[in-house]
Amino acid sequence: MEMEFPKIVAILGLGVSGCAIAEALLRRGVKVVGADEKVSLDELERREYVERLLGQGLELILGKNAFARLIGLQPKLAILSPGISVHREDIKALARSGAKIVGEVEFSYRLLAEELGRDKVCLIAVTGTKGKTTTVHLIARMLEASGLRTILAGNVGVPLAKFVDEFPRDKESPPVRVVMEVSSFQLATCETFRPDIAAVTTLFVDHLDWHSSVEDYRLSKAKIFANQRGDDWAVLNADNAGVRWMAQFVRGKILWCGKEVASSCPYCTHWVSDDGEIVWASLGGDKFPVARLSEFILRGEHNRQNLRVAIGTALLAGARPDVIADVIRNFKGVPNRLELVGEVNGIKFINDSAATTPDAAAAGIRSFDAPIVLIAGGRDKGGNWNGFEKALRERVKALVAMGEFADRLVAMSMKVGVKVTKASSMDEAVKRAVEFAEPGDIVLLSPGCASQDMFRNYEHRGEEFRKAVRELSSEN
């Protein structure tokens, strides 16, 4: 069944997902107006993609007031990219003008449900303040290695709208497992989105620069369960207080994952736990071993929590335990997440650029026993810095502060007695860090902040760190 569309559809934000949705709509003969706050075509990250869409009939509005200018066109549907807050005044004005504001995940899900049919897809959605990307990569590899047709979609992998267009329409096509990473931004605008399996890694405070309040952020995350049915699953990290709070919103069945959940939750029938050496699981019967923790290369308790959630989710989706163990042995991690990028003169350089919250940075700091010279800072997102300050006091020998939050970090470092300096570029930050470091130390980029004050995104920040380390290595 083909989905029906209004005469004009607006796309707000022309990133990867925005362009994919625009292309899907243009294929269906819809008039599409793309709006982006970049002031020129050359500034768009997906410039070549947008140019191709212009050739297919896309109309384009650029500039700082691009979204407000859409009002004059009176679109009845506006599809929002994840980074654009529904609480902005120009978005509220667009809604008051008669436009239905829908997020890109919600729109793509409707496209999937109406044109493909839900029986063709086992939809696995993973959310959480941190840990999503590592977890979805683990799940996808476990399913693929088990011989199950699997697509990695959403924030990482293929945009969901693009997957819908490329999926075979014949009835004989086997069901596919779609593994998606979904953010609070995307969930906030969901109305019908229903994953068969909804997994949650962690819940801390984050994105208060986008959400109207802490409560708004938490409730947006909980919307991942809103449309689930009694036979759907939630996979929850029992070792995180925020995730335990989310359990009250679950409508289906729960598989708990935790360090001691097997002993602390005797009434639980489905769980993943470990005894410090072996990861065990139960799917309603006797427990069985899955993997050895010593064979999992990623550091830190937070990554072990991600692993347990990934195992539970993959088992529910049909992965084989012996294959899961093999994937764990060979998994090397994901870029920008405690990634070893080099060693110079006995000093290891670790890229944790994806740590964009204070809690994530604190977890990164606590992943190492060696002395740490920390590079941190950027644009604060309104998080709680108490845990970071404690980790700074206990585990960091010196700090190089960057970006808009640098002065706050300097004051924090002086308060806890940690050596500190400031840097105005990543190249300078790495050089300053080396001045503090000695052989055996770790230089850790774990910013605790967003990147957009100095970089395009956290990936760009991580690449600049790699580049600075490469240049340092070539000089020695």
Model regions: which residues?
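Nucleotide phosphate-binding/pyrophosphate-handling subdomain across enzymes
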Residues: E2-I8, A20-R28, A291-V396, A411
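Residue-level signal for inorganic ion chemistry
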Residues: L25, A78, I101, V126, ...
